[in-house]
Amino acid sequence: MPEAQSRFRRRLLLYYGLFTLGLFGFVGMMGLLEKSNADALWLGYVFLFITIAIYACIGLICRTSDLNEYYVASRRVPALFNGMAIAADWMSAASFIGLAGILFASGYEGLAYVMGWTGGYCLVAFLLAPYLRKYGGYTIPDFLAARYGNGKPGGNLPVRAIAVLAASLCSFVYLVAQIQGVGLVVTRFIGVEFAVGIFFGLAGILVCSFLGGMRAVTWTQVAQYIMMIVAFLVTVSMIAWKHHHEALPQLSYGTLLSQLDAREQQLEREPAEQAVREYYRQQAILLQERIARLPDSFAQERDALDARLQDLRTRNAPLRDIKSLERERLEFPRDPAAAQQQWNQQRADALARSRHSLSSTEPYPAASEQERKTKRLNFVLLVFCLMVGTASLPHILTRLYTTPSVKETRNSVAWAVFFIALLYVSAPTLAALVKFEFFQHLVGTPYAELPQWVVQWRKVDPPVFGIRDVNGDGIVQWAEILLQPDMIVLAAPEIAGLPYVISGLIAAGALAAALSTADGLLLTIANALSHDVFYHMVDRQASHQRRVTTAKIVLLGVALFASYVTSLRPGNILFLVGAAFSLAASSFFPVLVLGIFWRRTTAAGAVAGMAAGLGVAVYYIIVNYPFFTRMTGIFGNRWFGVDPIASGAFGVPAGFAVAIIVSLLTPRNAPVIDRLVSYLRKG
């Protein structure tokens, strides 16, 4: 067996080495085509379609109906390649697209994501990885049902049921974020509408996972990791070399950051910049007056908007103006309560733009000491939620089942940290490089001479980039630029003036990041529903073939529903990902840790703990996140000023407390559970 595993590893090294060489050759060939004046749009098509075709071929080659292959890739994935697959599973659209963007927009505060996501793997390696692999199984609900099952065949059904619900919910929220990332990439680089881009992405996701399950997903994820890391590192190095003559800008990040800080301070002192911020200060005052006059102001603003729209139609105004006003009318609040919520948010945005821009180096910038304390609290709690969420995500933990041994599992986590760090040490550098490009080549530019990339990105729907001459001086000011952080990485090659082939490469990398995570998430949901619900709760006599077929049908249904939800545009990518982490942490972290390290934890305690943790986190998000408050009309107060993305800060303690209290109030577990815990922790 060791010799066979060694031959298998050498064969994989050869295959993926050739794939990497082929990737560089393909990029070089596309560069030559661009130099020969090939259409840039067609280059974008080729990059996206060729890479998806490669993933589809791997998925087709790895198709299987074997149960072990479909659920856990026969538990024979070597540590090196499982580390790459974990990294690809982990480095979602949020990491690839969103991380550099949030560092660009928020500066120091964005480091919470780097610290939380990286630190979480320490918890995985020391608290969970060896014990879950030693148990085996197919899903996380499998482990929980057995640990809290008191030796019953099939384990404890209530524990399994609530674990399936929690796994499906947090994975589904995360899945929506990935499909949204795919839609953004496709919309920009192929030029289709966002809804069409979503279903294009759906096809890409399904070709990787539908036929081969975990086996197909594992080997496509290895290829996708290579694609995304090559795309990211090449882009960072080329931007740095073109403008700063450095091939490894990560080593001089501190110097670049000092230059940025000096430029930011200079901008804040310029009169034109101050005039723009004064405009937004006045807008905030007007919105406050409008809020104070509710509900009368609601009817007045609605009627005024209707009158303007009717006037445009009567005068046969340009269709663009009519469409813009129709969109504004469609987004107008439906009642005074919703108006108050929306105008409060707009007032907060205007106030934020009226203040000094966020420094790249200043921790917790704020106008008052109380606001600074609130920001510090949110920073710390977000790091906490991301760390424990990392250690609780079902699609990551399931990968621990795919290695040949406990030792290989530990090694694969170590490799995963290394592969993830390659991107994470480069993301802050890319954010700084792109911001430097903004300061050098956009801020201070006449509006009549805007670069072509600005024109292109202003056309993207939903809007991700906007710029308006607020003070009427005809010159772009820093405060006049409004952008979604998600566009920074995708636009980076164009902003830096690199060849379009690099834009195609970064788009292919972003697509790989979204597809790799989406595949893992989709498989987690489908396997939980087919294995834990269908097999364990509906039909215990189902054949292996029927179970795999059921998993494929469920996978297709979940993918279609997730695409529909994504088309509703529920929020930015980074918030959805953060919410998924809080939900996973609140529901799974307490019962996993207690289940391994405290023998006294009972099934009743586990059910109550998961329900309490998940319930608290879901409630806090629903009553505080604008997308849900607009839908439900329910508005809540933020506890201690904590953002809804960090709802796990309340859910995790609630889960621990309830699980411990209920366990102490209920009878002890059967001796078989004590023996199971001893076995897991032995050696």
Swiss-Prot record:
At the top level, the lineage of the source is Bacteria
Where's it found, cell-wise?
Cell membrane
Topology relative to the lipid bilayer, per the entry, is: Multi-pass membrane protein
- Keywords of the record: Cell membrane, Ion transport, Membrane, Sodium, Sodium transport, Symport, Transmembrane, Transmembrane helix, Transport
A Gene Ontology MF term for this entry? Answer: symporter activity
List where the protein spans the membrane.
12-32, 41-61, 84-104, 110-130, 162-182, 194-214, 221-241, 377-397, 413-433, 495-515, 548-568, 573-593, 603-623, 645-665
Keyword Transmembrane helix among record annotations: yes
Does the record's keyword annotation contain Repeat? no
This protein's GO cellular component annotations are:
plasma membrane
Offer one Pfam family short name for this entry.
SSF
Q: Give an example GO biological process.
A: sodium ion transport
Cite the NCBIfam families for this sequence. Na_symport_lg
Q: PANTHER family in the record, alphabetically? A: NA(+):SOLUTE SYMPORTER (SSF FAMILY) (PTHR48086:SF5), SODIUM/PROLINE SYMPORTER-RELATED (PTHR48086)
Similarity-based family? Belongs to the sodium:solute symporter (SSF) (TC 2.A.21) family.
Q: What is this protein called?
A: Uncharacterized symporter H16_A2524
State the organism of origin.
Cupriavidus necator (strain ATCC 17699 / DSM 428 / KCTC 22496 / NCIMB 10442 / H16 / Stanier 337)
